[in-house]
Amino acid sequence: MYTRSKVVGPGLGTSSISRDHAGAGQRRELGLQQNRRQSLEVAAPEGPKMERQGHADQGSAGTYTLIAPNESRRQKIQRIAEQELADLERWKQQNRAKPVYLVPQRLGGSQSEAEVRQKQQLQQMRSKYQQKLKRDESIRIRKEAEEAKFQKMKAIQREKSNKLEEKKQLQEDIRRATFREHHQSKTAELLSRLDTERRNRSACLIAPPATQSSRWKLPVLLRDPSWAGSQAHRDSPQKEDNPRLQKTRDGHQKNKLLETKGQHQEEERAQIHQAEHWRVNNAFLDRLQGKSQPGGLEQSGGCCNMNSTDSWGL
C-alpha cells in the first residue's frame, strides 16, 4: 500500500497562514463596528423623527435591520406583568390549603376474621332475598300499571256505550213523538172528515120537508119518478150511517189499543236489546280483564265460548 503525502513548500505555507490572519482581522473589525453601532443606537435618547430615521438607515446599512424598542409600551407591559404576578401570589396565599386536624382513633382490628366472614355471608344471603323482593316489587308495579290501563280502557268503553245508548234512546223518543203527532193529526183529520160528512147527511135529511112549500111552484118534481127514486136512494144511506159510525169508532178504539200494545211490545223489545247489549259489553270487558291477569285466559275461556255466538251476532 502506498500513501500520498502532501508536500507543502515554504512559499505556499506562508501564504495560507497570512491569508488566515488577514480574514480573522477583517472579521474582528466587522464585529467591533457592529457592536459600536448597537451601543450607539441603544444609548441614544429618543429624538425627533428624522434622527430615528437616520439611525435606522445606519442600522440597515449592515447585514440586518435593528428596530429600536418602544420604551413606554415596554415599561407598561412590564408593570402590568408585575401587577398580575403580585395578584397571583396574593391569591395563592389566600387560597392555600389549611392544615387538617383529625382526632386520633383506632383503625381496624375491632372484629375478628370469623366475624367479618360471617357478616359477609349474611349480607350475601340477604342480597339474594333483596333481589327477589325487588323483582317481585317490579312485577307488582307493572301489573298495577297494566290493570290501571285496562280499567281506564273499560271506563272509556263504558262511557262510549252509555253515550250511544243515550243517543239511541233520544232518537227513539223523537221517533215516537213524531209518530204520535202524525197519528193524532191523521186521526183528527179522519174524525173531522167523518163529522163533516155526518153533518152534510143530516142536512140532507132535514132539507126535504122544505120542499113542501115548493110543491105549488114545482108540482112536476113530485110527479117525476126519477126524483122519488133518488130521494129514496139518499135516505137509505142515512139509515146505514149510524151503524157505520159505530163501526168506525170501534175501529178507532181498536187501533188505539193496538197502538198502545205495539208501544209496550216495542219498549219491551228495546229493554231486551239494551240488556243484551249490556251483557255483550260486560263479556267483552271481562275478557279484557281476564287477559290482563296471569290466569285470566283459563278463567274467562268458558265465558268467551258461551257469549261468542250471541255477542257478535248483533
Curated annotation (Swiss-Prot):
Record field: compositional bias (Polar residues): 305-314
GO terms (BP aspect): cellular response to lipopolysaccharide; cellular response to type II interferon; gene expression; homeostasis of number of cells within a tissue; inflammatory response; macrophage activation; macrophage differentiation; protein localization
Disordered, as annotated region: 1-72, 227-272, 289-314
InterPro entries linked to this entry: EPSTI1 (IPR026185)
Record bears the keyword Zinc-finger: no
Coiled coil: 71-180
Biased composition regions of type Basic and acidic residues, renumbered to the chain: 18-30, 232-272
Protein name according to UniProt: Epithelial-stromal interaction protein 1
Purpose of the protein: Plays a role in M1 macrophage polarization and is required for the proper regulation of gene expression during M1 versus M2 macrophage differentiation. Might play a role in RELA/p65 and STAT1 phosphorylation and nuclear localization upon activation of macrophages.
Tissue-specificity statement: Expressed in the spleen, with expression in T cells, B cells, natural killer cells and natural killer T cells and high expression in monocytes and macrophages.
Up-regulation conditions: Up-regulated in macrophages upon induction by lipopolysaccharides (LPS) and IFNG.
Inactivation phenotype: Down-regulation of M1 macrophage marker genes, including Il12a, Il12b, Cxcl9, Cxcl10, Cxcl11, Hif1a and Il23a, and up-regulation of M2 marker genes, including Arg1, Ym1, Msr1 and Ccl17, in M1 macrophages. In bone marrow derived macrophages, impaired induction of M1 macrophage marker gene expression and impaired phosphorylation and nuclear localization of Rela/p65 and Stat1 after LPS and IFNG stimulation and enhanced M2 macrophage marker gene expression after Il4 stimulation. Reduced number of MHC class II- and F4/80-expressing cells within the population of M1 marker-expressing macrophages.
Protein species of origin: Mus musculus (Mouse)
Residues with the Phosphoserine modification: 39
